[in-house]
């Protein structure tokens, strides 16, 4: 384990072409033009781009870079990149020059035909464009392949449709910026020039030994275990959560931090999570589009560094049954360029009219578009988490906490809030411990969308998913609520009276979305149904939300998605679900046919030989006989379930692609998979460990 000392401040951002580097290297005029583009969206002329490209190239070469790539996030959900070297055509003397033009910086042309488009373009229509997102800084990534200049970009088709997640995210950020500024102007704010959603993503993950990982085909092919009985101990003692970090894991975390700090990712918090072998990394918040890029970098770094330590990083939402899965809490707030957090209630929120209007608008947005918010977290792996007493339920609700709920209740009942509850002081009863300031409200870990002091925490997002989609939805639905409020208030004769009436109206009309209780309880499921809140339990049931008339009207109004782009994304998600379940089913078939059944057959022969030997010795063989009967019965159940899964999977493959096929995989193939797993997991508790064909749960999660 490396123990070399270093100063974080010295290495932080050393491989980022950030504002400090640009100020040092770019001519003053060029730097000012670029800042105008970043801050005000002004066009960047090619002459300026040429200068930036040259300096960026020179800087990258000094860092050892030989190639550059337009780094983008297509609809596969993972980043994509094509590497080009800086060399030009060889000169007559056989030498080469290292070149990089403004045109190469601003635009790239990857082949778009092999990326998901959901019917937006035919396979033969191959041209696509990447466009430089200058608001997210370029960086040099150093790995086994050398050093590469990575330029964050958006990705679109030849005809302009978004083929990525960055483009609609940037559109949604522009929408909320415009509408939030309208709202601020109503309150007399003339100084703020820009409003930006600020995001921080808490990343959960598992680590397992690489050699043990390689023995599990299910982990290799699907990222999760498809078979596996629980060991005698799981997470019931709560001794792993915040426990002492093992030396091997601590060494891994140290190297992850170093790699992230060098590329400007402000990794802040690390700890053991609830499940054995589960951990979390959380950064400091930043602008939404940068946070999306940094989270993708974080996931890549976790995987890459794990391999260097003889580990494998599992980002699947549910790699192991019986213990908690992994999520990604998306912490979201709205801040101005001059430091105002629109979600900061202050010490007396009942007097903070601007905050109360923002809060009322968010309640309206989430209540109206709960289905869209749920869909933004839809993922095949997340189907195993949501509503399973380890993650938020699949029902969208908002937790406000005691203080804000009290203010809301006052406003709804009387139209006026006269006081705010305070947290006060916490006396521990120990004279040597300091008196602590108590927060005005507790936390609620069971809520999918919780207010946590000066931000909202959306807890539904899956651990391996990009945070782009949830933030696209959040930005857009809140922009709509702001716009609706501004349309009313800008026409009001008496602003103060109108804004108080509007706050009361929004709070009253959307009160059903507020729930401060236990989201894991059956009582809440029943109560949510009485309130008319949607309970969307699966990805397949969630997808239709993005193509409703309501969704199309919303996204087209703010130019975030066209109807065609929404329909294409729905098609892509149905296809992704079907493919994911198909791969899982085929993997189960392969493992059952080639590993489990052969192992069971050998074991029954061993048992049968033992029974015969014991009987021949003239002693009681009832225990051996009973075990043989039990194993044989479960083996027969396994074979019948395997045959059924083979047939069901073949039937699914023959279905019409899209919603029909995805629905069949969900309703027929998934239950058939569960039916195959059940007898195999029972047999794992009976069969001799030496005869078991792969690493057990105990081996994987306790021997790291």
Language-model-detected regions and their locations in the chain:
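Hydrophobic/aromatic-rich, well-ordered segments within soluble, folded domains that form packed cores
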Residues: 65, 69-71, 294-308, 334, ...
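C-terminal amphipathic alpha-helical interaction region
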Residues: 508-704
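Active-site core of metal-dependent hydrolases
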Residues: 11-126
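Active-site proximal loops enriched in glycine and acidic residues that flank catalytic Cys/His/Asp
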Residues: 48, 72, 101, 283, ...
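Glycine-rich, acidic/polar active-site loops that bind/position phosphate-bearing ligands
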Residues: 126-315, 324-327, 334-571
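Short, compositionally biased "basic patch" segments
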Residues: 1-9
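Short linear, low-complexity motifs centered on an aromatic residue
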Residues: 77-93, 110-113, 118, 216, ...
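Composition- and surface-driven signal marking solvent-exposed, interaction-prone regions
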Residues: 220, 295, 317-318, 344-348, ...
